[in-house]
Amino acid sequence: MLNVTDLRGQTPSKSDIRRALPRGGTDVWSVLPIVQPVVEDVQNRGAEAALDYGEKFDHIRPASVRVPAEVIAAAENTLDPLVRESIEESIRRVRKVHAEQKPSEHTTELSPGGTVTERFMPIDRVGLYVPGGNAVYPSSVIMNTVPAQEAGVNSLVVASPPQAEHGGWPHPTILAACSILGVDEVWAVGGGQAVALLAYGDDAAGLEPVDMITGPGNIFVTAAKRLVRGVVGTDSEAGPTEIAVLADASANAVNVAYDLISQAEHDVMAASVLITDSEQLAKDVNREIEARYSITRNAERVAEALRGAQSGIVLVDDISVGIQVADQYAAEHLEIHTENARAVAEQITNAGAIFVGDFSPVPLGDYSAGSNHVLPTSGSARFSAGLSTHTFLRPVNLIEYDEAALKDVSQVVINFANAEDLPAHGEAIRARFENLPTTDEA
């Protein structure tokens, strides 16, 4: 089922590896002309425009953008107790990890009386997008909300698409997760129009704009984020989900097959890639996938994803080459199924998250490992990171020099002012001291 790319007997460069690897992705540029008028209309007409587009695209128009408090409360009250227990346990685990991510203020003394202090200031108001589509994602509510709360974000709003089968409001499980987390502002709006409304708000409708937008979504959500970036901050662009498994002959073929299938379940564009130095394992995994995918509830979606050009098996000479390949692929999720898996994992530099050993599968990270599941895709893990408490914090420097400390470094500043032909900079220093030479004399 999975196509095979054979890199054995080669010494490929980074460029060669990137060209050879199966890779999906979405062409965001192609939908920008569709999304831009939506964003501009929502900027001009606010909530009414957002509701109009929801009715046009999704054939549903909620009674209001903001979900009433009683609807949110009812969703929590009717939540399945087992689902509630799982949500609460995942919140506990994710909160424990993200609470420890918060950095501490620190001060550096450059000279007596001259200090620079770095403080970490939370974003004031954040919009968290939770998609609808093929599945219900209360886990995304957790993964976006908890790090923002741990960072100290003052105001949170969740936006999620309205559902016709639920009275035009977001899915009750989404609303229940919001309620459990203490998020009482939820907007029943999805797609690019949700991103635009979060960015620009609507004063007349009582919808305050945000300072940052995070959360995964489809290509239209991604395009809208690109269009409003600069008006607000955004997290990294999220393409279709992906898993890479780096495995040797010691790997359990059944478990590897299940992990590849589980990621393919998300989306027909999802990528599932096995990187291995064992031809026998490759054959075994392909056989196990063929035997097992059809019994999953989402078999048709899984089959299309696994047969797509974005999925496949990559054969390499040895695990050291496999590490190079994995680094160039820079997977959203990377599983290590090798001997000495931790030692291999420590050699990886590019991945959204690394899952070490047979008992650390990606589905654990999707829900309750404690790590975050909002991760960079499409190779962007080479230069970006997943969602964390850091995402919602801004480092701000406080520069504090007394007279002696400034005088000690004043000539350095004046010399730079001369070199850059910005004499007023030097004069701003000299004016504070009587005996310093003028900028021209320095």
Curated annotation (Swiss-Prot):
Enzyme Commission number(s) from the entry: 1.1.1.23
Ligand binding (Zn(2+)): 263, 266, 366, 425
Keyword annotations of the record: Amino-acid biosynthesis, Histidine biosynthesis, Metal-binding, NAD, Oxidoreductase, Zinc
Names of required cofactors: Zn(2+)
Molecular-function annotations in GO: histidinol dehydrogenase activity; NAD binding; zinc ion binding
Any Gene Ontology biological process: L-histidine biosynthetic process
Pfam families assigned to the protein according to its UniProt record, in alphabetical order: Histidinol_dh
Positions bound to substrate: 241, 263, 266, 333, 366, 420, 425
Entries under PANTHER family matching the protein: HISTIDINE BIOSYNTHESIS TRIFUNCTIONAL PROTEIN (PTHR21256:SF2), HISTIDINOL DEHYDROGENASE HDH (PTHR21256)
Entry function: Catalyzes the sequential NAD-dependent oxidations of L-histidinol to L-histidinaldehyde and then to L-histidine.
Cited NCBIfam families: hisD
Record-given protein name: Histidinol dehydrogenase
Gene assigned in the entry: hisD
